[in-house]
């Protein structure tokens, strides 16, 4: 039997695809151009006619054919460059067949044919007649190729949560005390005392203490202090100390860097030269990198102290030859009345840097960060605020974290009056009068023994020192507590520094990303797998689905029946444990199929399950139409902002951006839902997965364990981390950034030059402590009053004509000028705004925040079914009153509502022992408990009488325990008002005056003295980076512009009903931005 043979034939042609003009083409060309040219000549009978020997040159151009007779010149010469666009076409006449040349990858080829093609809109594949789409190709084309949609989603960068174990850290914990100075901008707060203490690396601490002494700070009780009421002295000295400390730390790093890398040049070496040396491998890769971190810490310093001192501490380091070897970058962010970031990095090239590899990614899953992971080494200077990490006052933080030191008390008003006018009201021992203290207990507790003099200033110094010591203890407790949490709860093998990030929100977000990266088997890169951030057009679409919470009363007035307050336990934490969108979004084709299938289910008669595996997670545009009026309830499922105000309404919802959870909730509540399948923007995912459940479960378990062990520190940490996670996903971004002109990056500069960005405002940060030269001295030689000449006055002769132009002397007023010795760019802050209409986002998975709020609305919907399910078909006016006030996560229930909760809703009470975390059992996981509990026996207590004036403005008269009969104090909520001047009787009198009288006889108001912070953008009434006191008076009155319709009147109040088709919203709806009949009108015109 003969062996089989295989004949291999080489292909004579190849092809490439592209588009020429507006059409797609497939270009087939000959691989062997010599044979192709010979065939071309034979086809035109050139060789047989003239019997010439054909010599094919390397480059085939029209010059090759110049030896041909004139009457046989080829007709057409054309070429297509790179297969995308026609390059040239020459009509030369003649009798030969057209010749097409292709220039491809630097070579010339003879084209056999150009075949027109079609392109699939779903996957981008080009074909002649037909083809079969591939799911993965469709998704890749939608996410990475198609220009209209490839910018909709961005990968989220990941970095391990750990801190460098070899970094040397120095903490500067400080506090200031201020008094009121009457400036041109009002009552400006000026520091008169600064106290600080150094903690951390012993070598850095000794150097810092030496610099503090050199700058004029005095040691006192293991701290350093400066007492001076002059406006700029303390700020100037504190700035000098910080700058000198940065310079010495940088000099120390640089001296060792030179030794390790044998840099012998005595002249200045620039950072660019060091980078070039690193690229040429002239730096030693085995030298251990060094890192120094200087952390300025205080309590509420980003919202007060750093702003008061801003004109000094915001001045950057001088970029002179002394520091030219460092790359100095600054991260500066004033936001929401706080200086969130003011970090400075002084970087040197890290020769030990290694590109991440497979083993690196596996190490990152444990949170371990090492020096070889960073491209730089050097000094990092940070400003951190313990308020942003504890969300409480210093006194409450001391209790929450079980600190042994106490904060003390200080009569601020007496000190303020003393520094303003030099005296204050006091007794014979100089002890401040009672009006300066907040209570009688505080007044008596701090009063010295008879005959002992009270030193007000010394007490202020001691009080400030105590504050600093409490903050020092808090810093230690936070460092050790979070390290323990990272080791024992998160099970990570890394060093953790809680002050590496500025807020609790950024800390918990980093922890979530770390745990998510650790749990994903496909996590082998610098980005989070299967979790993306919406950007540009998609970011705006997703943000429209992030709706605010519910907050309004169902009753306005004085309610005299017993009622209780029920609260959902950890609502956002429970919502985070439910399934979320997972993976990339589907292509338009697959999305259309999924939306159509979901619409079919929505059109069905049966209720839908939130956890139906055949329903994909999606955020789409939809219209929703309510059922008949008697089938509605007083807790609407959704809110709308079409009228300009957020209204929870039972009116039709048109063009709203909704999640899958919202759509199922509306369907189950009897609403008719229509998905807009031809909407411009949509997001459909293929899979549900509880992304945050593991992290939330860990925090809840840690909190319960800390409760059992009475570990208040771990309880506070786990509770804060759990509650702050939702807020990190819901962070709203914008197109603005505030930068110093001297620190503007090359990227920002190029965007400004190209017109992609523009400077919308400029702010100067000038300090009187800068070196300056004043010309007011010359004023004494100008603007002198003109005195009549005494000799002329004695003579009768008329004075001679004055020998200068003009009839008035000193008609120009001399104005002195002050010259500052500083670079302009060091004093200018620019607000740079992108000219793009869309916001770029590569940090936050905003769709998670949208679904968290949707799950929380599903909780409230299920709660509404428990309370109002039996009222379906009954008019509003005939229903029993079951709730009088509602907030995002709470309801004030009447006796009837309480009865329903302990009967029909017993399984949703926390005492039932059910889980707060979703367990894949097809049921929503949420529990409630009674917030008004008895302080003695912990039983559910009720309020006998309450007054509701407006959202977040109400008062409970008392709380009465039905078990033990204890009557305790009530509850007051008055957002935006000074609670000190509001009582239950005041709110009750206010409502009755407005309710019973046509014109109230008395005007009710609250007064307080808030602090107004001005950051980068100043005005005529406020200077940049100043803190001033403002007297604010607010009128107390019933809900002035309610977003609900008035219902049934009661004896001391009335009910409020949601808007519906019978009681429509009186506000105008969203106006049309264009004529909807534009096309028709243009045709008839």
Curated annotation (Swiss-Prot):
Record key words, sorted:
DNA replication, DNA-binding, DNA-directed DNA polymerase, Host nucleus, Nucleotidyltransferase, Transferase, Viral DNA replication
GO terms in the biological process aspect are:
DNA-templated DNA replication; viral DNA genome replication
* Stretches the record annotates as Disordered: 1059-1085
E.C. number: 2.7.7.7
Q: Which reaction does it catalyse?
A: DNA(n) + a 2'-deoxyribonucleoside 5'-triphosphate = DNA(n+1) + diphosphate
Q: Which Pfam families match?
A: DNA_pol_B_2
Name assigned to this protein = DNA polymerase
The organism encoding this protein is Snake adenovirus serotype 1
């Amino acid at each position: 039997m003969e062996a089989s043979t295989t004949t291999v034939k080489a292909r004579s042609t190849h092809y490439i695809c592209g588009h020429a003009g507006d059409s797609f083409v497939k270009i087939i060309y000959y691989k062997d151009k010599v044979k192709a040219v010979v065939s071309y000549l034979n086809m035109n009978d050139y060789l047989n006619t003239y019997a010439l020997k054909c010599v094919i040159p390397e480059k085939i151009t029209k010059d090759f054919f110049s030896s041909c007779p004139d009457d046989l010149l080829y007709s057409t010469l054309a070429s297509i460059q790179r297969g995308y666009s026609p390059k040239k076409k020459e009509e030369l006449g003649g009798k030969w067949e057209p010749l097409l040349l292709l220039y491809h990858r630097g070579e010339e080829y003879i084209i056999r044919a150009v075949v027109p093609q079609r392109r699939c809109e779903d996957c981008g594949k080009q074909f002649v007649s037909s083809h079969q789409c591939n799911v993965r190709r469709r998704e890749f084309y939608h996410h990475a190729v198609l220009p209209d949609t490839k910018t909709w989603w961005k990968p989220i960068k990941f970095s391990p949560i750990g801190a460098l174990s070899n970094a040397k850290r120095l903490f500067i914990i400080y506090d200031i005390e201020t008094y009121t100075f009457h400036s041109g901008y009002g009552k400006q707060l000026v520091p008169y005392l600064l106290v600080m203490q150094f903690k951390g690396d012993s070598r850095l601490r000794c150097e810092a203490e030496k610099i503090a002494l050199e700058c004029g700070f005095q040691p006192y009780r293991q701290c350093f202090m400066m007492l001076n009421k002059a406006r700029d002295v303390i700020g100037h000295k504190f700035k000098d100390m910080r700058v000198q400390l940065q310079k010495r730390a940088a000099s120390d790093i640089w001296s060792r860097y030179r030794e390790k890398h044998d840099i012998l040049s005595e002249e200045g070496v620039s950072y660019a030269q060091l980078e070039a040396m690193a690229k040429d491998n002239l730096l030693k890769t085995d030298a251990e990198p060094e890192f120094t971190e200087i952390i300025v810490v205080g309590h509420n310093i980003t919202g007060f102290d750093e702003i008061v001192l801003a004109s000094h501490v915001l001045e950057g380091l001088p970029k002179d030859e002394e520091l030219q070897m460092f790359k100095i970058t600054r991260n500066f962010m004033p936001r929401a009345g706080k200086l969130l970031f003011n970090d400075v990095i002084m970087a040197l090239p890290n020769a030990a840097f290694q590109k991440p590899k497979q083993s690196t990614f596996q190490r990152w899953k444990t949170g371990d960060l090492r020096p070889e992971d960073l491209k730089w080494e050097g000094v990092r200077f940070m400003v951190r605020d313990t308020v942003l990490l504890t969300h409480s006052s210093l006194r409450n933080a001391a209790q929450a974290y079980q600190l042994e030191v106490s904060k003390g008390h200080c009569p601020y008003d007496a000190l303020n009056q003393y520094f303003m006018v030099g005296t204050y009201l006091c007794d014979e021992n100089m002890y401040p009068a009672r009006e300066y203290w907040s209570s009688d207990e505080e007044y008596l507790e701090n009063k010295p023994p008879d005959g002992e003099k009270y030193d007000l200033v010394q007490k202020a110094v001691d009080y400030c020192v105590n504050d600093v010591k409490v903050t020092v203890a808090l810093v230690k407790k936070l460092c050790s507590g979070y390290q323990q949490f990272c080791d024992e709860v998160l099970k990570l093998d890394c060093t953790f520094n809680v002050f590496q990030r500025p807020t609790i929100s950024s800390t918990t977000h980093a922890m979530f990303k770390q745990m998510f990266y650790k749990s994903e088997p496909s996590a082998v890169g610098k980005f989070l797998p299967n979790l993306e951030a919406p950007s540009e057009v998609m970011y705006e679409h997703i943000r429209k689905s992030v709706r605010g919470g519910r907050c309004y009363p169902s009753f306005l007035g004085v309610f005299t029946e017993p009622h209780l307050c029920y609260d959902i336990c950890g609502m956002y934490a429970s919502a985070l444990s439910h399934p979320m969108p997972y993976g990339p979004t589907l292509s338009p084709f697959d999305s259309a199929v999924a939306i159509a299938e979901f619409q079919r289910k929505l059109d069905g008669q049966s209720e839908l399950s939130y956890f139906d595996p055949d329903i994909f997670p999606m955020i789409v545009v939809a219209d929703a139409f309510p059922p008949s009026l008697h089938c509605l309830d007083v807790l609407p499922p959704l809110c709308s902002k079409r009228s300009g105000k957020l209204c929870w309404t039972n009116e039709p919802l048109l063009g709203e951006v909704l999640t899958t959870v919202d759509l199922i909730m509306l369907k189950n509540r009897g609403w008719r839902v229509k998905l807009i399948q031809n909407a411009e923007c949509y997001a459909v995912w293929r899979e549900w997965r509880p992304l945050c459940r593991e992290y939330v479960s860990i925090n809840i378990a840690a909190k319960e364990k800390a409760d059992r062990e009475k570990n208040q520190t771990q309880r506070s940490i786990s509770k804060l981390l759990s509650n702050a996670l939702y807020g990190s996903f819901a962070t709203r971004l914008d197109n603005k950034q505030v930068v110093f002109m001297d620190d503007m990056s090359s990227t920002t500069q190029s965007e400004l030059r190209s017109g992609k960005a523009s400077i919308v405002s400029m702010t100067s940060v000038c300090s009187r402590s800068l070196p300056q030269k004043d010309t007011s001295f010359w004023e004494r030689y100008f603007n002198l009053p003109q005195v009549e000449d005494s000799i002329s006055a004695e003579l009768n002769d008329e004075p001679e004509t004055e020998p200068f132009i003009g009839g008035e002397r000193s008609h120009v007023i001399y104005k002195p000028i002050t010259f500052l010795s500083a670079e302009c760019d060091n004093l200018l802050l620019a607000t740079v705004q992108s000219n793009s209409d869309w916001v770029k986002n590569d940090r936050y998975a905003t769709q998670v925040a949208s679904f968290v709020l949707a799950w929380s609305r599903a909780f409230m919907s299920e709660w509404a079914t428990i309370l109002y399910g039996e009222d379906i078909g009954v008019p509003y006016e005939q229903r029993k009153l079951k709730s009088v006030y509602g907030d995002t996560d709470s309801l004030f229930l009447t006796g009837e509502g309480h009865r329903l909760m302990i009967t029909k809703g017993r399984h949703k009470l926390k005492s039932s022992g059910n889980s707060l975390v979703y367990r894949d059992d097809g049921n929503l996981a949420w529990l409630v408990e009674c917030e008004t509990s008895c302080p003695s026996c912990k039983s559910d207590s009720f309020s006998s009488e309450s007054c509701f004036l407006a959202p977040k403005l109400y008062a409970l008269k008392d709380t009465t325990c039905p078990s033990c009969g204890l009557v305790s104090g009530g509850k007051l909520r008055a957002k935006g008002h000074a609670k000190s001047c509001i009582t239950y009787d005041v709110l009750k009198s206010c409502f009755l005056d407005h309710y019973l009288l046509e014109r109230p006889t008395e005007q009710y108001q609250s007064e307080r003295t808030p602090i107004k912070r001005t950051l980068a953008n100043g005005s005529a009434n406020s200077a940049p980076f100043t803190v001033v006191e403002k007297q604010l008076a607010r009128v107390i009155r019933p809900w002035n512009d309610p977003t609900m319709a008035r219902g049934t009147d009661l004896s001391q109040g009335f009910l409020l009903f949601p808007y519906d088709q019978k009681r429509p919203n009186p506000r105008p709806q969203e106006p049309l931005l264009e004529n909807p009949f534009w096309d028709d009108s243009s045709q008839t015109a």
